[in-house]
UniProtKB/Swiss-Prot annotation:
It comes from the Eukaryota. Keywords: Disulfide bond, Ion channel impairing toxin, Neurotoxin, Potassium channel impairing toxin, Secreted, Toxin, Voltage-gated potassium channel impairing toxin. It comes from Androctonus mauritanicus mauritanicus. Potent inhibitor voltage-gated potassium channels Kv1.3/KCNA3 (Kd=0.65 nM) and Kv1.1/KCNA1 (Kd=41 nM). It appears to block channel activity by a simple bimolecular inhibition process. Induces a transient period of fast flickering in the channel openings, followed by an almost complete blockade of the channel. Its binding affinity to rat brain synaptosomes is 5-fold higher than this of KTX-3. Binding of the toxin to the channel is associated with significant structural rearrangements in both molecules. This is Potassium channel toxin alpha-KTx 3.1. Gene3D superfamilies: Knottin, scorpion toxin-like. Residues 26-33 are annotated as: Interaction with Ca(2+)-activated K(+) channels. Coiled coil: none annotated.
Amino acid sequence: GVEINVKCSGSPQCLKPCKDAGMRFGKCMNRKCHCTPK
C-alpha cells in the first residue's frame, strides 16, 4: 500500500483520507494510513 501522512488508531478512519487521496481501501498500520492505489 501507499503510506499517506494521516494518523489513525483504526482502519475505518482511513477510508475517507484514502478516498480523498484518489485511492481506495485504507488500512491503519503503525498509526499511519496506508492506501491501495486504484
